[in-house]
Amino acid sequence: ILRGLVGSEMCIRDRNEVLRLTQSQVGYSYRAVVSYIDSHGTREVLYTSPSETIDNLDDPVQGEVTIIGEPKEGVTLRALSNSLSDEDGIASISISWETSKDGRNWVGVNSLSGPVLSLNQSLVGSQVRARVAVVDNFGIETNLYSQATRTVANVNNKPSGRIVIRRVGQ
């Protein structure tokens, strides 16, 4: 019987079984303990040296970012990131917005971050997407992107101001 000691956890395994490391073993070391009965009927116990501490392997962020709202001037879009998860835990999530005229080259929307974006005249004719930066509990940052919106449609704005008529000549 192979017994692996992981931190303070005892993992009892059958002969020739492999101990598969999981997230719960990160930060611990382990050793194998082998016990057997020798040919004289005496129980023998062998211990391996402790392993190095188990390092974390970056687990991918699961889920997707969704945009709610119609891509039209004057409308507010909302990026939803509540379906995101990471086996390493999530320390922080930040949302920013990007715009593109061609759907290939993306530029950050200046100084706008957070889950909402108000579509104004400067975004008309562009596609918009949300960029979500997820930092896990081990400090690894992963960027995810929403699907791009359709092109932001223009709204025919009412003219504003006043008309002044001046007489020219006599």
Describe every region a protein language model picked out.
Residues 73-82:
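A short beta-strand segment in extracellular, disulfide-stabilized domains
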Residues 8-9, 94-101:
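Conserved aromatic beta-strand anchor motif in extracellular beta-sandwich/beta-rich domains
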